[in-house]
């Protein structure tokens, strides 16, 4: 049976991640509060941001920006979108 979590993005019980997505306290918190569905959506959005804004992940400012966007995305706050992107209905 899949591990279930109360997803902070969708505000409902959904299947959780198999492993923490990153090390440390932040990874543990995400593991306990973010669903597999929300995390997969974030990864897709993150890829769009990296490509659209041509972010260099070796740059600490780019990593900070992505971390801020991740928090906004997962907390249903206003987050940056790729220019011209129209989400599927």
UniProtKB/Swiss-Prot annotation:
Belongs to the Fe(2+)-trafficking protein family. The keyword Transferase does not apply. The keyword Manganese does not apply. HAMAP family: Fe_traffic_YggX (MF_00686). It holds the Pfam family Iron_traffic. GO terms for cellular component: cytosol. Keywords: Iron. InterPro entries: Fe_traffick_prot_YggX (IPR007457), Fe_traffick_prot_YggX_sf (IPR036766). It comes from the Bacteria. Could be a mediator in iron transactions between iron acquisition and iron-requiring processes, such as synthesis and/or repair of Fe-S clusters in biosynthetic enzymes. This is Probable Fe(2+)-trafficking protein. One of its GO terms (biological process) is cellular response to oxidative stress. GO terms for molecular function: iron ion binding. It comes from Hahella chejuensis (strain KCTC 2396).
């Amino acid at each position: 049976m899949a591990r279930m979590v109360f997803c902070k993005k969708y505000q409902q019980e959904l299947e959780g991640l198999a492993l923490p997505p990153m090390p440390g306290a932040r990874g543990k918190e995400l593991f306990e509060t973010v669903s597999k569905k929300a995390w997969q959506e974030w990864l897709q959005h993150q890829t769009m941001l990296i490509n659209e804004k041509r972010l260099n992940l070796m740059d600490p400012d780019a990593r900070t920006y992505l971390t801020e966007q991740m928090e906004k995305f997962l907390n249903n706050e206003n987050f940056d979108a790729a220019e011209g992107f129209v989400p599927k209905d």
